[in-house]
Structure formats: structure tokens, C-alpha cells
Design a protein with these regions (language model features):
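Cation-handling catalytic/transport regions enriched in His/Asp/Glu
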Residues: 1-264
Length: 264
């Protein structure tokens, strides 16, 4: 990481920038807002979201009956267990198809396209790369979803979040030039995160009696992510504004910001 910061700083200076921040914004396709706008957003999260998150974590600690809520406890929401889909991968895909057909004719057409052409690689397999994502295959004008189902709520979120990305790029597949098929990076998340919420009325068919646990887990998880997201962003601004910082100074900077955004 130390070497990466210095390489990026040299790149930026060679191109005439004061530091890597402005170049980084361009590389991330942040064209409509600047670091001042992002700083203002961080302040709003600090003022409005961090107190709410502190309350959510306090309620979680009480709900679990712990004296202290440790970092490794944070993903454990209910003493009865976190919500998980009740069905196999094959059945979940069938239910997702029905869901998208009922949501709108266009989303139904899209998901039929995905399933008929086997454009979802969802099973966990030995040697398979970790993670999940949606990409686009230009020669076939097709989205492709890659994931590793593991019988947790993330399986359902693949069929909503990544499908949100896939529906957007499916709808944009005829746009030319090809660079405009995807929007900017942050704008991409509008489609994926929105889809997660659009399909709430159908989640009972995935989680059955645990659906309310899923709603709580999903919504509170989205709120809890905001301070962490801006923490990472703030840290990167500090690092690239002061590339001469030592590793120890960067660690101290991270810890200082962590206490600010994640005080629980």
C-alpha cells in the first residue's frame, strides 16, 4: 500500500495535478461533484447517521445479551439466528424469475433472457474465485452475474443487487459508444441498491417466516454501512493529501477516523 500511494502520487504529479485526489476522482468518473461536496456529505453522515447507528448497535448488544459488542459480533443480529433463504439455488432462481415477471414486463423479459442463456454462475465450487459481481460481455450484448451462494441472505441479495446492475446494463446494451453502457461508478449503485428495495414485497417467498428479520437486517445493514463507507473515503483523502506519511502515521490516522465514524 505504501508503494501504491507513492506510485499514484508520481502519476498525478507527472500529469500536472497537485496530488492523486483529483486524478483519482477522474479515474472513478466523479464528474459532477468534487472533494468539497464529498466532505459535506461526510459531515452529514457524521451528524445524522452515526448517532442512529450508535442506537442500532446499542439495541443489538441488548438484544443479544452481551456486556460488550465486539467487532466479530456485529454481523450476528438475532439470538435465533440471522435470516437465510429457505430454498435451494435452483428454486431461488425460479422464484426470482416469477418475482421479476410480476414486478414489470421489462424486468421479466430481462430475467428470462438471463436464465434462458445461462448468464448466472451462482454455485460455490472448489477453486472458484470468491465474491460476486455483474459484468457485461460486449460481443454478446449480455450481462453476466457471478456469485458464490452460501445459504445466507447474501444469496437473495445477489438476485436483487447484482440483478439491478444487470438490468441496467441490459437496458443500455444498445448504447454506443460502448463506454457509455455503464454509468459512472457511484451511479451504478443507484440501480443495484434500488432493486434491493423494490423487491421487498416478494421477499416472503424467499425467507418465509423469517421475512421480517430479513427486512430489519437488510435495512439496518444499509444504514450501518454509510459511516464505514465515508470512513474509507475520508482515510483515502488523508493518505493522498499527505503521501509522505509513514505506515505508523497512516495507522494512527485510520484509528482516529475510526473512532469518529464508528465510535461504538
Amino acid at each position: 500500500y505504501y508503494q501504491l500511494v507513492h506510485v499514484r502520487t508520481r502519476m498525478a504529479k507527472k500529469l500536472g495535478y497537485e496530488n492523486y485526489i483529483e486524478l483519482g476522482y477522474y479515474r472513478m468518473m466523479r464528474f459532477d461533484y468534487n472533494k468539497n461536496d464529498v466532505e459535506n456529505y461526510r459531515k452529514q453522515v457524521l451528524e445524522d447517521v452515526v448517532p442512529l447507528d450508535n442506537e442500532l448497535y446499542a439495541r443489538q448488544q441488548k438484544r443479544l445479551g452481551y456486556d460488550t459488542l465486539h467487532a466479530w459480533d456485529e454481523k450476528f443480529e438475532f439470538t435465533s439466528g440471522n435470516p437465510a433463504p429457505k430454498y435451494s439455488r435452483e428454486e431461488l432462481v425460479k422464484r426470482a424469475l416469477k418475482m421479476y415477471q410480476e414486478l414489470d414486463p421489462k424486468t421479466g423479459e430481462f430475467f428470462e433472457f438471463m436464465t434462458e442463456r445461462e448468464l448466472l454462475d451462482l454455485d460455490s465450487k472448489p477453486g472458484k474465485a470468491a465474491g460476486g459481481y455483474c459484468t457485461f460481455i460486449p460481443n454478446y450484448q449480455s450481462p453476466f452475474i457471478f456469485a458464490n451462494f452460501n445459504q445466507t441472505s447474501h444469496d437473495a441479495e445477489v438476485l436483487t443487487h447484482e440483478a439491478g446492475h444487470a438490468f441496467q446494463v441490459y437496458s443500455s446494451k444498445d448504447i454506443f459508444p460502448i463506454d457509455c453502457v455503464w454509468p459512472t461508478y457511484e451511479s451504478c449503485e443507484i440501480h443495484s441498491m434500488s432493486m434491493e428495495f423494490f423487491i421487498y414485497p416478494w421477499m416472503k417467498s424467499f425467507f418465509e417466516e423469517d421475512v421480517n428479520k430479513y427486512y430489519f437486517n437488510h435495512l439496518s445493514g444499509a444504514v450501518k454501512f454509510l459511516p464505514y463507507g465515508v470512513l474509507v473515503d475520508h482515510f483515502q483523502h488523508e493518505v493522498y493529501e499527505k503521501p509522505e506519511m509513514s505506515c505508523e502515521e497512516r495507522l494512527a490516522t485510520w484509528r482516529k477516523l475510526e473512532k469518529q465514524y464508528l465510535p461504538h
